From Swiss-Prot:
UniProt keyword annotation of Glycosyltransferase present: no
GO MF terms held by the record: structural constituent of ribosome
InterPro entries assigned: Ribosomal_bL27 (IPR001684), Ribosomal_bL27_CS (IPR018261)
Origin: domain of life: Bacteria
UniProt gene name: rpmA
Entry annotated with the keyword Mitochondrion: no
Keywords: Ribonucleoprotein, Ribosomal protein
GO biological process annotation, one example: translation
Renumbered residue ranges of the record's region Disordered: 1-24
Polar residues: compositionally biased ranges: 9-20
GO cellular component term, pick one: cytosolic large ribosomal subunit
Identification of the protein by name: Large ribosomal subunit protein bL27
Family recorded in the similarity comment: Belongs to the bacterial ribosomal protein bL27 family.
Length: 84
């Protein structure tokens, strides 16, 4: 007979990689055109003036300026206030 118990197998021990979502540039921060403002799944934030939306719902700056968060028709929107 064995004096040591055989090592048991387990079906656990895995986890998926984080998606690194969230706001990347906050209100008042100055951004250049093309910079990512928000990484999101679905439209938690909607694009406003000077902001574009990618195929994965990522919001990015179309123009250089300061980031501004607000609401429009009950939706959270992100605008870019162009710099002088």
């Amino acid at each position: 007979m064995a004096h040591k118990k055989g090592a048991a197998s387990t079906k656990n021990g895995r986890d998926s990689n984080s998606q690194r979502l969230g706001v990347k540039r906050y209100g008042g921060q100055v951004v250049n055109a093309g910079e990512i403002i928000v990484r999101q799944r679905g439209t938690h934030f909607h694009p406003g003036s000077g902001v574009g939306r990618g195929g994965d719902d990522t919001l990015f700056a179309l123009v250089a300026g300061a980031v501004q968060f607000g609401t429009r028709r009950g939706r959270r929107v992100v605008n870019i206030v162009p710099g002088e």
